Amino acid sequence: MSSHTNLPSPKPVPKPDHRISGTSQTKKPPSSSVAQDQQNLKCPRCNSPNTKFCYYNNYSLSQPRHFCKSCRRYWTRGGALRNVPIGGGCRKTKKSIKPNSSMNTLPSSSSSQRFFSSIMEDSSKFFPPPTTMDFQLAGLSLNKMNDLQLLNNQEVLDLRPMMSSGRENTPVDVGSGLSLMGFGDFNNNHSPTGFTTAGASDGNLASSIETLSCLNQDLHWRLQQQRMAMLFGNSKEETVVVERPQPILYRNLEIVNSSSPSSPTKKGDNQTEWYFGNNSDNEGVISNNANTGGGGSEWNNGIQAWTDLNHYNALP
């Protein structure tokens, strides 16, 4: 008899269990099902299925945070509902500020007029109109030039066109103007000095222009003398007087007829009194000329004669 027929069948060997004691292996649901459940959640406020998963609060899987797109609010599962105001979670686009169209437009006529008027007012503050002239020239006060009256409150230059050829020629009197400028009183004491032109209107106008040009030259010369006196002092006053330029017109206007040698020359009656004023040098020259009248060296041009030459010896 064979021994192989009565052997028992072997028992199956059990598989070893690799589970660690004290721990239990839990099966996680698939991620697809979890995402589907999270997407199917409805908003607890508006019951809108239009929700989305944001993140896990405090990194805890039990507190997922969702956002409702319809009511724009957040909520957390297992937590309190937050009272988030409507529209608080959206980002509003900033509107670009359009440039003001009024800035590009030209100013109106009224604004431009106000602008130019303000400019004129500012310029008048720095450059006031010449109302009065206050010059102190060689001790002569030329204040209140507005009181200058020529031809008895009449204009010196009549620039209006003369239509008729037979119009009467008006005399041009510069006496009051010369009296105010320190050249003597011509209206009261010396009446024959009024310049009267006979002829056409062009001659009258030309003579008046020449008169004013002569006065302008004299005033300019006096200004130069004052500036030279201020710069170099009073020591060079005599030399400056000697270098005085000759004016073009009306320099030797005779005030008193002193051509006769027999008549004594008085102080202040010389023919250039209105030009030089009361100058001490002039008076000395006039008195010297009066004393040397008998010696044949009487000079009427204001230059002192050399009479005392006897003490000089002749050359060998």
From Swiss-Prot:
Biased composition, class Polar residues, residue ranges: 21-42, 257-291
Main location: nucleus
Keywords: DNA-binding, Metal-binding, Nucleus, Transcription, Transcription regulation, Zinc, Zinc-finger
Positions annotated as zinc finger (Dof-type): 41-95
Compartment list: Nucleus
Single GO biological process annotation from the record: regulation of DNA-templated transcription
GO cellular component: nucleus
PROSITE patterns per UniProt: ZF_DOF_1, ZF_DOF_2
Protein name listed in UniProt: Dof zinc finger protein DOF5.7
Skewed-composition ranges (Low complexity): 101-111
Region (Disordered): 1-42, 92-111, 257-294
Gene Ontology molecular-function annotations: DNA-binding transcription factor activity; sequence-specific DNA binding; zinc ion binding
Positions that bind Zn(2+): C43, C46, C68, C71
Organism of this sequence: Arabidopsis thaliana
Primary gene name: DOF5.7
Function of the molecule: Transcription factor that binds specifically to a 5'-AA[AG]G-3' consensus core sequence.
